[in-house]
Design a protein with these regions (language model features):
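Glycine-rich beta-strand-centered segment in the early N-terminal region that forms part
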Residues: 21-35, 50-98, 137-139
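Glycine-rich phosphate-binding loop and adjacent beta-alpha segment
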Residues: 215, 247-310, 347-353
Length: 353
């Protein structure tokens, strides 16, 4: 089979022919329909400082946002059968640590990531734990299924710990409208937010945010986001702030435009320490600060399925580019250009379910 491989600890990747892997006990072999490019994949492709410190096995096949058809099942697999169309949860949990045993497998102490710690999905076939294969029902386009994993990140951040009830009829601010931020705009709109405010310096992504349902678009290059949000909310601020950028200045602004008693979900990863006014902007506000990683397994997947299968969120505008796998260099260049949102690649000739 063809697979995109990180063949050496240096920038770039190679398209190679490698054997089709066999599923072991508790595993399934998935014939990949589509895989989308994530920021993690860009790091690995560029072989930046993060990748050098995180990726421990080279050569390897990378890529982790994926959907496809189960081609074969290993021993002791009972809940998923050959021919099922699945999306894949990329957090591979141990199942036995204290966090797994208390229902928080997405923050497993021994967590492994598909396409980082194991061979991934930029290939014609990929082996994954059967428990990580989420059966995609009718009503979800196969291409959309390939981005259910990052869409789930946005679902987790937007729903928070209260099932999204704090969004209903309230103003919501999304800071950073990359793909996950754009997804969050659509989710907040679907959950009944009174006003969805998108804060994003990139002109094209602000336009996409409007297509996803944003009511107010703020360019932080020309307008003060704190003043703009306070003006739009009668001085109250946003009841929910979804911070997707990881930018230190934006995170600080997020606490300042957050309403008293409001909730701020942090998903964007800053490059280093961030300075915040904890006294006035967090403690005295009784702000709820919620760190977000991955997806709750598998509550988030059910929420994701409902939003997509019912059409409550249309993610078509976010998928801006499609490439066959043999044009991977162009695909990665496009994903890193700032002129794309979600880029998906197709390893096989047949792009239909």
């Amino acid at each position: 089979m063809r697979a995109l491989r990180k063949t050496a600890p240096r920038p770039g990747a190679e398209l190679e022919d490698v054997p089709v892997p066999d599923p072991g006990e508790g595993e399934v072999l998935v014939r990949v329909h589509a895989a989308s490019i994530c920021g993690t994949d860009l790091h690995i492709f560029d072989w930046n400082e993060w990748a050098q410190g995180r990726v421990t096995r080279v050569p390897m096949t990378f890529g982790h946002e994926v959907a496809g058809t189960v081609e074969a099942v290993g021993p002791e697999v009972h809940h998923v059968q050959r021919g099922a169309f699945v999306a894949v949860e990329t957090h591979i949990a141990c199942g036995v640590c204290s966090t797994c045993r208390t229902g928080r497998a997405h923050i497993c102490r021994n967590l492994k990531i598909l396409g980082v710690d194991t061979d991934g999905a930029f290939a014609e076939y990929v082996v994954v734990p059967a428990v990580n294969a989420w059966i995609v029902g009718e009503g979800i386009h196969p291409d959309h299924a390939s981005v259910m994993e990052p869409f789930g990140n946005a679902v987790h951040a937007t729903f928070g710990t209260e099932g999204g009830e704090d969004l209903l009829t309230n103003p919501v601010a999304v800071i950073g409208c990359g793909p996950i931020g754009l997804f969050a705009v659509g989710i907040a709109r679907a959950l009944g937010a009174w006003k969805v405010i998108a804060i994003e310096p990139n002109d094209e992504r602000r336009s996409l945010a409007a297509k996803m349902g944003a009511d107010l678009l703020i360019d932080p290059k020309t307008d003060d986001p704190v003043e703009a949000v306070l003006d739009a909310t009668d001085g109250n601020g946003a009841e929910v702030v979804l911070e997707m950028s990881g930018n230190a200045t934006a995170i600080d602004q997020g606490t300042r435009l957050l309403a008293r008693g409001g909730r701020m979900s942090l998903l964007g990863l800053p490059d280093g320490p961030v300075t915040l006014d904890l006294n006035d902007q967090v403690i005295f506000k009784e702000a709820r600060i919620l760190g977000i990683t991955g997806r709750q397994m598998f509550r988030t997947w059910q929420q994701t399925t409902t939003l997509l299968s019912t059409g409550r969120v249309d993610i078509s505008p976010v998928i801006t580019h499609r490439f066959p796998l043999d044009r991977f260099e162009e695909a990665f260049e496009t994903a890193a250009s700032g002129h794309a949102a979600k880029v998906i690649v197709f390893p096989g000739a047949n792009h239909q379910r």
